[in-house]
Amino acid sequence: MNQTLLSDFGTPVERVERAIDALRNGRGVMVLDDESRENEGDMVFAAEAMTLEQMALTIRHGSGIVCLCITDERRQQLDLPMMVTHNSSQFQTAFTVTIEAAEGVTTGVSAADRLTTIRKAIADNAKPADLNRPGHVFPLRGQPGGVLSRRGHTEASIDLATLAGYKPAGVLCELTNDDGSMAHAPEVIAFAKLHDMPVVTIDDLAAYLQSRAKKAS
């Protein structure tokens, strides 16, 4: 990743700490992956703290595919099968079947309905019957070990939410440009500045977690 583009957001460690602080205070962050990977920026929120206004922003400026990033333990609690038995996608993105809250929604597609679905799915006592399948929210199963085992936006979302003191669940959506094309680093950074969101890269987060692990050992 071009560090010059990111210089306004601090050093790699500062970027991670500012992202954690933003989530802790109920704000969203922009997460960039490597230029050699998807080279995309995702809007990321802690699922537990996401607001209706943030969901509306996500739908308005994103791809429309709003994803709930969860652990495999949560996936099993909700009895959500994987979307396919053989994942042939390039980066092994682990979609489960899509979901909708069984109660409290209309068509399921509005910002309020999607937020209701997410809140139902992450509730401590959530059970399979709380959700209908299919729906308009796309759960993603994170890999155990987070970004240290897979350098994906899914794992970064869960890791960041956890570091901020929330349940291990994040909401993400890819940022798109006005013409419908995918936003890359320059557009992501411009969007982040406009909406007062920190920017962090997955490599930043991985290095931060590796450093913490070394200090703890």
UniProtKB/Swiss-Prot annotation:
GO terms for molecular function: 3,4-dihydroxy-2-butanone-4-phosphate synthase activity; magnesium ion binding; manganese ion binding. D-ribulose 5-phosphate binds at R37, E38, D42, R150, R151, G152, H153, T154, E174. It comes from the Bacteria. The gene is ribB. Belongs to the DHBP synthase family. Mg(2+) 2 binds at E38, H153. It holds the Pfam family DHBP_synthase. GO terms for cellular component: cytosol. The keyword Metal-binding applies. The record marks H136, E174 as: Essential for catalytic activity. It comes from Yersinia pestis. This is 3,4-dihydroxy-2-butanone 4-phosphate synthase. PANTHER family: 3,4-DIHYDROXY-2-BUTANONE 4-PHOSPHATE SYNTHASE, GTP CYCLOHYDROLASE II-RELATED. It catalyses: D-ribulose 5-phosphate = (2S)-2-hydroxy-3-oxobutyl phosphate + formate + H(+). Homodimer. The keyword Magnesium applies. InterPro entries: DHBP_synth_RibB-like_a/b_dom, DHBP_synthase_RibB. Catalyzes the conversion of D-ribulose 5-phosphate to formate and 3,4-dihydroxy-2-butanone 4-phosphate. Binds 2 divalent metal cations per subunit. Magnesium or manganese.
